[in-house]
Protein backbone atom coordinates (compact mmCIF):
# COMPACT_ATOMS: atom_id res chain seq x y z
CA UNK A 1 0.00 0.00 0.00
CA UNK A 2 1.42 3.38 -1.03
CA UNK A 3 2.20 5.69 1.87
CA UNK A 4 0.22 8.93 1.80
CA UNK A 5 2.38 11.92 0.94
CA UNK A 6 2.49 14.46 3.75
CA UNK A 7 1.49 18.06 3.12
CA UNK A 8 4.29 20.58 3.48
CA UNK A 9 2.82 21.74 6.78
CA UNK A 10 2.57 18.18 8.15
CA UNK A 11 6.07 17.40 6.86
CA UNK A 12 7.57 20.32 8.79
CA UNK A 13 5.49 19.47 11.87
CA UNK A 14 6.88 15.94 11.81
CA UNK A 15 10.42 17.27 11.56
CA UNK A 16 9.76 19.65 14.46
CA UNK A 17 8.57 16.74 16.59
CA UNK A 18 11.93 15.05 15.93
CA UNK A 19 14.07 18.13 16.61
CA UNK A 20 15.55 18.15 20.15
CA UNK A 21 16.03 21.93 20.16
CA UNK A 22 12.43 22.66 19.16
CA UNK A 23 10.47 19.91 20.93
CA UNK A 24 10.86 18.87 24.58
CA UNK A 25 9.98 15.23 23.89
CA UNK A 26 12.51 15.04 21.08
CA UNK A 27 15.10 16.41 23.48
CA UNK A 28 14.96 13.11 25.34
CA UNK A 29 14.81 10.67 22.42
CA UNK A 30 16.31 12.26 19.30
CA UNK A 31 19.95 13.11 18.62
CA UNK A 32 21.50 16.01 16.75
CA UNK A 33 24.93 16.87 15.44
CA UNK A 34 26.39 20.37 15.30
CA UNK A 35 29.00 20.74 12.57
CA UNK A 36 31.54 23.47 13.43
CA UNK A 37 32.27 24.80 9.94
CA UNK A 38 31.50 28.49 10.56
CA UNK A 39 34.39 30.22 12.37
CA UNK A 40 33.69 33.82 11.36
CA UNK A 41 31.38 36.20 13.16
CA UNK A 42 30.12 39.63 12.14
CA UNK A 43 29.11 41.01 15.53
CA UNK A 44 30.84 41.14 18.89
CA UNK A 45 28.51 40.45 21.78
CA UNK A 46 29.74 41.61 25.17
CA UNK A 47 29.07 38.15 26.62
CA UNK A 48 30.91 36.11 23.99
CA UNK A 49 34.44 34.77 23.61
CA UNK A 50 34.81 32.26 20.77
CA UNK A 51 37.25 29.37 21.19
CA UNK A 52 38.27 27.03 18.38
CA UNK A 53 40.46 24.52 20.24
CA UNK A 54 38.68 24.04 23.56
CA UNK A 55 37.73 20.63 24.94
CA UNK A 56 36.61 21.65 28.44
CA UNK A 57 34.01 24.41 28.25
CA UNK A 58 30.41 23.58 27.38
CA UNK A 59 28.72 26.62 25.87
CA UNK A 60 27.93 28.19 22.49
CA UNK A 61 30.90 29.59 20.59
CA UNK A 62 33.20 26.74 21.61
CA UNK A 63 34.55 23.83 19.57
CA UNK A 64 37.57 21.56 19.79
CA UNK A 65 38.35 22.18 16.11
CA UNK A 66 36.91 24.01 13.10
CA UNK A 67 36.08 21.53 10.33
CA UNK A 68 36.21 21.88 6.57
CA UNK A 69 33.03 20.83 4.71
CA UNK A 70 34.69 17.53 3.75
CA UNK A 71 35.71 16.85 7.35
CA UNK A 72 32.21 17.75 8.55
CA UNK A 73 30.66 15.24 6.14
CA UNK A 74 33.05 12.54 7.38
CA UNK A 75 32.04 13.32 10.97
CA UNK A 76 28.37 13.16 10.00
CA UNK A 77 28.85 9.74 8.40
CA UNK A 78 30.50 8.41 11.57
CA UNK A 79 27.73 9.84 13.72
CA UNK A 80 25.00 8.40 11.52
CA UNK A 81 26.47 4.91 11.87
CA UNK A 82 26.91 5.20 15.64
CA UNK A 83 23.70 7.03 16.61
CA UNK A 84 20.49 5.37 15.38
CA UNK A 85 18.24 8.25 16.51
CA UNK A 86 20.20 11.00 14.73
CA UNK A 87 17.53 13.18 13.11
CA UNK A 88 19.11 16.65 12.88
CA UNK A 89 22.26 18.15 11.39
CA UNK A 90 22.86 21.77 12.25
CA UNK A 91 25.38 24.56 11.93
CA UNK A 92 25.72 26.60 15.11
CA UNK A 93 29.15 28.16 14.90
CA UNK A 94 31.55 28.55 16.51
CA UNK A 95 30.95 31.90 14.81
CA UNK A 96 27.81 32.78 12.89
CA UNK A 97 26.39 30.37 10.32
CA UNK A 98 25.73 33.17 7.83
CA UNK A 99 29.11 34.86 8.27
CA UNK A 100 30.67 31.66 6.86
CA UNK A 101 27.78 30.79 4.60
CA UNK A 102 29.74 29.22 1.74
CA UNK A 103 31.25 26.58 4.04
CA UNK A 104 27.89 25.87 5.62
CA UNK A 105 26.08 25.60 2.30
CA UNK A 106 28.67 23.21 0.89
CA UNK A 107 28.45 21.07 4.02
CA UNK A 108 24.66 20.81 3.90
CA UNK A 109 24.59 20.12 0.16
CA UNK A 110 27.05 17.25 0.58
CA UNK A 111 25.10 15.79 3.47
CA UNK A 112 21.81 16.01 1.58
CA UNK A 113 23.32 13.92 -1.22
CA UNK A 114 23.92 11.04 1.20
CA UNK A 115 20.94 11.49 3.53
CA UNK A 116 17.79 12.95 1.94
CA UNK A 117 15.76 12.65 5.16
CA UNK A 118 17.96 14.40 7.71
CA UNK A 119 16.55 17.65 9.14
CA UNK A 120 18.69 20.73 8.56
CA UNK A 121 18.86 23.66 10.94
CA UNK A 122 21.16 26.59 11.58
CA UNK A 123 21.67 29.26 14.20
CA UNK A 124 22.42 32.88 13.44
CA UNK A 125 22.49 36.34 14.94
CA UNK A 126 20.31 37.34 11.98
CA UNK A 127 22.45 40.17 10.61
CA UNK A 128 22.76 38.59 7.16
CA UNK A 129 19.34 36.94 7.00
CA UNK A 130 17.95 39.35 4.37
CA UNK A 131 20.78 38.31 2.04
CA UNK A 132 20.57 34.56 2.55
CA UNK A 133 16.94 33.64 3.25
CA UNK A 134 16.33 32.27 -0.24
CA UNK A 135 19.59 30.31 -0.16
CA UNK A 136 18.64 28.88 3.23
CA UNK A 137 15.30 27.71 1.88
CA UNK A 138 16.85 26.24 -1.27
CA UNK A 139 19.20 24.15 0.89
CA UNK A 140 16.20 22.50 2.51
CA UNK A 141 16.72 24.09 5.93
CA UNK A 142 13.42 23.78 7.79
CA UNK A 143 14.43 25.17 11.20
CA UNK A 144 16.33 28.37 12.00
CA UNK A 145 17.26 29.81 15.39
CA UNK A 146 17.86 33.56 15.61
CA UNK A 147 19.30 35.19 18.73
CA UNK A 148 17.48 38.45 19.48
CA UNK A 149 18.55 40.06 22.74
CA UNK A 150 16.81 43.42 22.49
CA UNK A 151 14.21 45.36 20.55
CA UNK A 152 15.41 48.70 21.91
CA UNK A 153 18.58 50.06 20.25
CA UNK A 154 19.56 51.89 23.45
CA UNK A 155 19.62 48.50 25.20
CA UNK A 156 21.21 46.72 22.25
CA UNK A 157 24.04 49.25 22.33
CA UNK A 158 24.96 47.90 25.78
CA UNK A 159 24.94 44.28 24.58
CA UNK A 160 26.80 44.54 21.27
CA UNK A 161 30.26 46.07 21.13
CA UNK A 162 30.08 46.38 17.36
CA UNK A 163 28.31 45.08 14.26
CA UNK A 164 30.26 44.56 11.03
CA UNK A 165 27.94 44.89 8.05
CA UNK A 166 29.05 44.87 4.40
CA UNK A 167 32.60 45.66 5.42
CA UNK A 168 31.76 48.59 7.70
CA UNK A 169 31.83 48.55 11.50
CA UNK A 170 28.82 50.03 13.29
CA UNK A 171 28.72 50.72 17.02
CA UNK A 172 26.25 51.95 19.60
CA UNK A 173 22.58 52.44 18.77
CA UNK A 174 23.34 52.55 15.05
CA UNK A 175 24.76 49.03 15.09
CA UNK A 176 22.01 47.68 17.35
CA UNK A 177 19.28 49.23 15.19
CA UNK A 178 20.76 47.80 11.99
CA UNK A 179 21.01 44.35 13.54
CA UNK A 180 17.42 44.44 14.83
CA UNK A 181 16.03 45.58 11.48
CA UNK A 182 17.71 42.68 9.68
CA UNK A 183 16.71 40.17 12.37
CA UNK A 184 13.02 41.04 12.21
CA UNK A 185 12.80 41.22 8.42
CA UNK A 186 14.63 37.88 8.15
CA UNK A 187 12.37 36.17 10.70
CA UNK A 188 9.30 37.56 8.95
CA UNK A 189 10.37 36.25 5.54
CA UNK A 190 11.51 32.84 6.76
CA UNK A 191 8.24 32.35 8.62
CA UNK A 192 6.19 33.38 5.59
CA UNK A 193 7.99 30.67 3.60
CA UNK A 194 7.16 27.92 6.09
CA UNK A 195 10.50 27.75 7.92
CA UNK A 196 10.09 27.17 11.66
CA UNK A 197 11.85 29.96 13.55
CA UNK A 198 12.92 29.80 17.18
CA UNK A 199 14.29 32.92 18.86
CA UNK A 200 16.94 32.66 21.56
CA UNK A 201 17.08 35.47 24.11
CA UNK A 202 20.04 35.81 26.46
CA UNK A 203 18.66 37.37 29.64
CA UNK A 204 21.13 39.86 31.08
CA UNK A 205 20.28 41.15 34.54
CA UNK A 206 20.01 44.92 34.72
CA UNK A 207 20.28 45.34 30.96
CA UNK A 208 17.50 43.61 29.02
CA UNK A 209 15.53 41.85 31.76
CA UNK A 210 12.83 44.55 31.65
CA UNK A 211 11.99 43.98 27.97
CA UNK A 212 11.92 40.19 27.60
CA UNK A 213 8.15 40.07 27.10
CA UNK A 214 8.39 42.87 24.54
CA UNK A 215 10.97 40.86 22.58
CA UNK A 216 8.68 37.82 22.64
CA UNK A 217 5.69 39.87 21.46
CA UNK A 218 7.65 41.41 18.61
CA UNK A 219 9.13 38.16 17.27
CA UNK A 220 5.71 36.51 17.55
CA UNK A 221 4.35 39.22 15.27
CA UNK A 222 7.09 38.26 12.79
CA UNK A 223 6.02 34.59 12.80
CA UNK A 224 8.36 33.06 15.38
CA UNK A 225 6.95 29.80 16.81
CA UNK A 226 8.89 29.40 20.09
CA UNK A 227 11.30 31.40 22.22
CA UNK A 228 14.17 30.17 24.36
CA UNK A 229 15.00 32.57 27.19
CA UNK A 230 18.49 31.64 28.36
CA UNK A 231 20.65 32.40 31.35
CA UNK A 232 23.73 34.51 30.66
CA UNK A 233 26.99 32.55 30.88
CA UNK A 234 29.60 34.97 32.36
CA UNK A 235 32.52 33.94 30.17
CA UNK A 236 35.99 34.80 31.45
CA UNK A 237 37.58 37.42 29.23
CA UNK A 238 34.26 38.84 28.03
CA UNK A 239 32.97 42.31 28.90
CA UNK A 240 30.21 40.67 30.94
CA UNK A 241 32.40 38.21 32.85
CA UNK A 242 31.45 39.77 36.21
CA UNK A 243 27.77 40.25 35.43
CA UNK A 244 25.42 39.02 38.16
CA UNK A 245 22.78 36.42 37.24
CA UNK A 246 19.12 36.17 38.07
CA UNK A 247 18.03 33.08 39.99
CA UNK A 248 16.70 30.01 38.24
CA UNK A 249 13.31 30.53 39.89
CA UNK A 250 13.19 34.09 38.52
CA UNK A 251 14.17 32.78 35.10
CA UNK A 252 11.39 30.21 35.13
CA UNK A 253 8.88 32.82 36.29
CA UNK A 254 9.75 35.03 33.31
CA UNK A 255 9.42 32.03 31.00
CA UNK A 256 6.06 31.20 32.57
CA UNK A 257 4.78 34.72 32.01
CA UNK A 258 5.97 34.66 28.40
CA UNK A 259 4.12 31.38 27.81
CA UNK A 260 1.01 33.55 27.53
CA UNK A 261 2.58 34.97 24.36
CA UNK A 262 4.47 32.05 22.78
CA UNK A 263 5.51 28.51 23.74
CA UNK A 264 8.73 28.51 25.76
CA UNK A 265 11.73 26.20 25.75
CA UNK A 266 12.79 24.92 29.18
CA UNK A 267 15.18 22.13 28.17
CA UNK A 268 17.98 24.05 26.41
CA UNK A 269 21.52 22.94 27.30
CA UNK A 270 23.30 25.91 25.64
CA UNK A 271 25.33 23.44 23.59
CA UNK A 272 28.78 23.67 22.09
CA UNK A 273 29.24 24.26 18.36
CA UNK A 274 30.42 20.65 18.00
CA UNK A 275 27.78 18.91 20.16
CA UNK A 276 26.69 15.42 19.14
CA UNK A 277 24.11 13.03 20.59
CA UNK A 278 21.01 13.71 22.67
CA UNK A 279 20.76 16.74 24.91
CA UNK A 280 21.30 14.48 27.92
CA UNK A 281 24.22 12.45 26.55
CA UNK A 282 26.88 14.09 24.39
CA UNK A 283 28.73 11.43 22.41
CA UNK A 284 31.33 13.50 20.60
CA UNK A 285 34.29 12.10 22.53
CA UNK A 286 33.04 8.55 21.95
CA UNK A 287 32.76 8.93 18.18
CA UNK A 288 35.29 11.50 16.96
Question: Language-model segments: which ranges?
Answer:
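Active-site mouth loops of central-metabolism enzymes
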Residues: 61-69, 204-209
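Short glycine-centered, acidic/aromatic-flanked micro-motifs in structured strand/loop junctions
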Residues: 91-94, 201-203, 255
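Short Fe-S-cluster ligation motifs
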Residues: 71-92
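N-terminal [4Fe-4S]-dependent radical SAM core
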Residues: 1-36, 41, 50-66, 78, ...
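Flexible glycine/acidic-rich beta-alpha junction loops that bind and position SAM and/or redox cofactors
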Residues: 154-161, 206-209, 226-246, 271-283
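Conserved AdoMet/S-adenosylmethionine-binding subsite of the radical SAM
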Residues: 97-230
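C-terminal accessory region of radical SAM enzymes
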Residues: 194, 245-280
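Short glycine-enriched, charge-decorated loop/helix-capping segments at active-site entrances
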Residues: 59-64, 160-163, 172-173, 241-245
Amino acid sequence: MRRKRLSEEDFVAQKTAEHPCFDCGAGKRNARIHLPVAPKCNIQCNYCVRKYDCVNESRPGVTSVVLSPAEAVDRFKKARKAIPDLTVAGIAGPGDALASFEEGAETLNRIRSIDPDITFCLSTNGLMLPFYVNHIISLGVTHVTVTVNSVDPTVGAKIYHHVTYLGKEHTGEEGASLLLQNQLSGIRYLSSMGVVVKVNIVLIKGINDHEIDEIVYMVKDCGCKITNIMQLIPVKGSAFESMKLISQSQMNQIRKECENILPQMYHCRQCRADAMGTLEHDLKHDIV
